[in-house]
Amino acid sequence: MRRLLSVLFAGALLGIPVNSNAQVASDYPNRSIRLIVGFGPGGATDTFARIFSGPLSKALGQTVFVENVAGASGYIGWRTVATSSPDGYTLMMAENALVIRPGFKDIKPQFDPSTEFTPVAFAATSPLAICVANTVPANNMKELIALSHSSTKKLTFASAGVTSVSQLIWDVVRDGADIDAIDVPYRGGGPAMADLIAGHVDLTLPSSQVAKPLLDTKRIKCLAVTGKTRSPALPDVPTLEEAGIKHADVDLRFWFAVFGPKGLPAVVTAKLQKAIQAALQEPQLKERLKSLDITPDYAAGPELHARVVSDVKNWGAFIEAKGLKGQ
């Protein structure tokens, strides 16, 4: 008893709430939660995060609000989460860009996504679509390839950033298809798509979820999708394989996953995982995701961590083999 009183007294003198972490974790969440997206509004990750935040809020019993923290191809948003308090009130919805950036050894500072975050849960996947402006005189990949080599005006490709998913997957596609185009990096997929619609750039590579409503309203053209099978959302658009395009053995889909700061308490992580799994099973969300060609694909922290480690290795090997630079 004397020892316990001494500990309590010492804690009070130092201003340390005794067992505060356990108390915070036990009633988590008791206020709203920030879900950081490292890119601007309108891109694939932002779109999924906003659709998903409603069912996740319902499952957690607290509001989950999306906050866009764009810059440096996602890095500013990721760093915001990495340096936040590990209490579960600042999370991030990340995508493949998180595992691509470490492969660019010329970019500083370097970071390791497998050790600097708490992997909470893998959530979903979505194929990408090769889209061109209506002003581009090409209606299939064969015509696009020919145009890229014959046009007096160089084609321009708009990416979500130098080290973004769209840029790297485009590098894989370009390598396999031998397409000649100038890269134009943007601060997110939303601005890139806006300029494609306006005809300021010729090509971009959004997720099929972003492409579908624009294709349906004939504001853009889609020439191919990156999945191994045709997209249910874009059934008339061929796959790269059907278009005769071979590519390196890397996964050419967007994936979406939830991470927290390093050191997130296990009880908080478990509550989040349970809520994420429940949210992904909500019938209305499943129908909404299906209409956008997003496939729920829940996996808990250990599996997500293994995926991060594997993807960092595979993308790093591709980047090194092709001599790609991030700056």
Locations of the language-model features?
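An extracytoplasmic/periplasmic, membrane-proximal ligand-sensing/linker region
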Residues: N30-S32, D175-I179, E242, A266-Q327
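HAMP domain helices
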Residues: V250-D251
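Short, low-complexity disordered leader/linker segments with a strong preference
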Residues: M1-N30, G326-Q327
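A ligand-binding cleft/hinge motif common to bilobed small-molecule-binding domains
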Residues: A97-D106, V172-G176, L203-V237, G316
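Hinge/capping helix and adjacent helix->loop/strand transition within the periplasmic-binding protein
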Residues: T83-Y89, P102-P191, L240-I245, W255-R288
